[in-house]
Amino acid sequence: MAKPKKENDLDLLIQLADALEAIPGDLSKNFTEVRFLEAELKDVYSQALSSIDDLLNRDTSVERRNLVARNLSLLLKSDDVQTRKKSHIAMYAEAITHSNVLRLEHCYQKMEMKLPNFFIPFTPEVIKEQKTSRPIRASRRRANLRNRRAKELLAAENASEEGDKKQIITDSGKLPETEELTETTNEDLDIKQFSPYSSESSANVSSYNKS
């Protein structure tokens, strides 16, 4: 007896590629046939409606009605055949898709037995990193928003202080610093007036010496 051939990795890859290619190819072929049948059925429906209108028309002769009735029966029979064909194609598409999926699963199982690390499992660590990175972005946005609000408040306070200074100038006509300067100059004048080196103090000293 001949020993059964062992499947190598290349044969498994070929079977896997064949199954992956067969699923969309068979489905597109079957759906195309169904669309053609639906287009033919639309023509049948329109002809059947026109035949029914002829039958309901009172002016139609008896011979014309008999002819329309025969044509209508033929249309209905063809409609029945096409409808059955459409349902058969749909059932065949379901069966062939199921068989292709089974082939695909069989290839996957063989691949996993031969190459345990062939299919990389889904790891949720990436999702965890995304979840941890989102709050960091949110905290940065909040910090930027707080800094921007603080800058806006500081600018508003500076603007209000400048407005108060302008209001003082318009009310008094001069700044408070000028008033302080005038007060200091008056004090200086009083000091000079009562200083021993002033002209009045020297005149008093001379009159005292003469006496």
Swiss-Prot record:
Q: Which GO terms describe its cellular component?
A: chromatin; nucleus
InterPro entries, sorted: ING_N_histone-binding
In this chain, the stretch annotated as Disordered covers 155-211
Instruction: Give the Acidic residues compositional bias ranges.
Output: 178-188
Which Pfam family, any one, appears in the UniProt record? ING
Composition bias of kind Low complexity appears in: 195-211
GO annotation, biological process: transcription initiation-coupled chromatin remodeling
What is this protein's name? Answer: Uncharacterized protein C16E8.12c
Q: Which organism is it from?
A: Schizosaccharomyces pombe (strain 972 / ATCC 24843) (Fission yeast)
For this protein's source organism, the top of the classification is:
Eukaryota, Fungi, Dikarya, Ascomycota, Taphrinomycotina
